[in-house]
């Protein structure tokens, strides 16, 4: 079963971002709480990488981040949803949202983690095939860099497509995981130009977060979380009662 979607304009992602910023300013306590959670997780990853002195811990750390990220985002979606309904958004109510339809959400989080682990295995395989000669010319590495980049882009596109609207859909309409995944994939496929812009905005926010040693997450993740809720509401067709 796939829930139908609307067609959105190329500039829509910037509108969602402005709505997310508006919610961020209007709900300082909730924004600060979830921002601190995201920031703590990001700082933990940065410190772990520095302490281990190796990039090998980056991907496992990101798998953990992929597992906890959707659950933290649920609280932000709930807060935006409450404001949309004209209710007072409270931190306690947003935290309760994390337990709503939890079996589907856990299944989805595990699926995301499996995708990340698969990605790690592909990356490790490509790395093992790299020329081992020190000082080998760049042309020897070029095919592996191109293949690695293409595989990474395809996997990133798939993960983004199945996850763009799945979590808010499971929270609001309590649908099963497969309905949410197919609906999200269909919505992204039907709005490719706008979704490329939205994916770039999200990547930019996460990069700013990590580039500032996790501190930027305090601001970027709540704004992106609220923005995702507005993106979901504008893209997925509403229920007709």
Question: Where are the language model's segments positioned?
Answer:
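Hydrophobic alpha-helical membrane segments
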Residues: 1-241
């Amino acid at each position: 079963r796939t829930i139908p979607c609307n067609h959105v304009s190329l500039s829509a992602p910037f509108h969602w971002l402005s709505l997310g910023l508006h919610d961020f300013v209007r709900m300082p306590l909730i924004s600060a709480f979830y921002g601190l959670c995201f920031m703590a997780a990001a700082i933990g990853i940065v410190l772990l990488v520095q302490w281990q002195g190796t990039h090998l811990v980056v991907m496992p750390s990101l798998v953990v981040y992929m597992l906890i990220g959707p659950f933290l985002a649920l609280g932000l979606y709930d807060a935006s949803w409450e404001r949309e309904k004209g209710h007072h958004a409270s931190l306690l109510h947003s935290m309760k949202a994390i337990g709503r339809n939890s079996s589907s959400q856990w299944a989805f989080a595990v699926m995301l983690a499996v995708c990340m682990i698969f990605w790690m295995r592909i990356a490790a395989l490509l790395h093992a095939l790299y020329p081992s000669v020190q000082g080998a010319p760049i042309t020897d590495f070029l095919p592996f860099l191109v293949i690695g980049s293409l595989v990474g882009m395809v996997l990133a596109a798939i993960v983004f497509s199945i996850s763009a609207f799945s979590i808010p859909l499971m929270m609001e309409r309590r649908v099963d995981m497969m309905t949410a995944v197919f609906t999200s994939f269909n919505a992204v496929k039907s709005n490719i130009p706008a979704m490329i812009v939205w994916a770039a905005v999200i990547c930019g926010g996460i990069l700013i977060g990590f580039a500032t040693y996790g501190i930027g997450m305090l601001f970027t993740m709540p704004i992106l979380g609220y923005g995702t809720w507005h993106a979901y509401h504008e893209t997925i067709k509403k229920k007709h009662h």
